[in-house]
């Protein structure tokens, strides 16, 4: 049947458009670091007096999918970095909150990361640093071989609460998109490159509130509770004469030397060897305990100190975004930041930025690696002796550093990293 055109059709179309507009997400902040970005961001003077403040470069990096798609990149080794931007203050109460950004570690990062922070209240952007109070932190965290995870912290009542779940992060030298979503039902999700890597409950995965249930402190294990899983086998008896078996016996193959003189050398005795019959102290075999009741556990009761917070997910004041980090090796590049209440909108933003260029960036990286390998191969034998000397020097330096670290009790790089 044909659809009749007219006023009813027009009204339906308008209602459909109105419905789409009603569910469209709100963007609180968006940054692609295009021309004019410096007017929106404030570089902190944190650590400047100590000559430890690093400079940011506006660049697309050594390899990229689009030379015109630039971000901000750390440029100096062993430096602190801090920069922030302000946006209209809002609260995520009764709404979803999405924080998303892209990051690329061109330097093949082995220790570091980068705190991307949401802050509220009054912040002096010129002094923003490691001690500045914040509401939310999300970052990929890499610490040598031990830590390679997405580091997420929520601050409530002045206390910083680290997520209790380990979510692996990307560790290569390409751009990756990290998304942190908090919902009004107190659930959250962590996405990497638009793929959900972890989801769960804020109640369960952060120790923001006391536990709802606790072990009953008054409960006692019953005296007749049998928690021995195995018991000695009453049927197993020690063989007669077992304790008389010697641990060692004279070597039956040993012969008295022909030139042995009993008067001068003393009475000859054969050397001993382990006795193959000796089995060590006798131990009674164990069997399953037929009366085993399991490990006793105190029953759980309601925690009298627990007080629910229906707005555990919410932050009353979100007004700034900051990037703050310490870098042993510089080269980390941040780009394409968005703060919104619509996960679908954030996903589209990622696809239109990172997604559009990821294949070209991978090709550029592969080409750069191939060129580097060819250049290294071209040097050939001329550098082999030098390389060997360098390796020996590096090994000696590592040994010296290990000795120094053993004395200090802590690696100096880790001290810098831990300072953050």
UniProtKB/Swiss-Prot annotation:
Question: What is the recorded function of this protein according to its Swiss-Prot or TrEMBL entry?
Answer: Molecular calcium-binding chaperone promoting folding, oligomeric assembly and quality control in the ER via the calreticulin/calnexin cycle. This lectin may interact transiently with almost all of the monoglucosylated glycoproteins that are synthesized in the ER.
SUPFAM superfamilies the record matches: Concanavalin A-like lectins/glucanases, P-domain of calnexin/calreticulin
Q: Outline the sequence repeats, range by range.
A: 197-208, 216-227, 233-244, 251-262, 266-276, 280-290, 294-304
Region of interest (3 X approximate repeats), residue spans: 266-304
Q: Where is this region: 4 X approximate repeats?
A: 197-262
Stretches for region Disordered: 213-285, 355-420
Identify the InterPro entries for this entry.
Calret/calnex (IPR001580), Calret/calnex_CS (IPR018124), Calreticulin (IPR009169), Calreticulin/calnexin_P_dom_sf (IPR009033), ConA-like_dom_sf (IPR013320)
Q: Which GO terms describe its cellular component?
A: endoplasmic reticulum lumen; endoplasmic reticulum membrane
Q: Which gene encodes it?
A: CRT
Which positions does the motif Prevents secretion from ER occupy?
Answer: 417-420
Which keywords, in A-to-Z order, does the entry hold? Calcium, Chaperone, Endoplasmic reticulum, Glycoprotein, Lectin, Metal-binding, Repeat, Signal, Zinc
Q: What is this protein called?
A: Calreticulin
The cross-references to PANTHER family, in alphabetical order and at most eight, read: CALRETICULIN, CALRETICULIN AND CALNEXIN
| Positions annotated with a glycan in the UniProt record | 57
Q: Which domain of life is it from?
A: Eukaryota
Task: Provide the taxonomic classification.
Answer: Eukaryota, Viridiplantae, Streptophyta, Embryophyta, Tracheophyta
Q: In which compartments does the protein localize?
A: Endoplasmic reticulum lumen
Q: From start to end residue, where is composition biased (Basic and acidic residues)?
A: 213-258, 355-381, 403-420
Q: Where is the composition biased (Acidic residues)?
A: 382-402
Source species: Zea mays
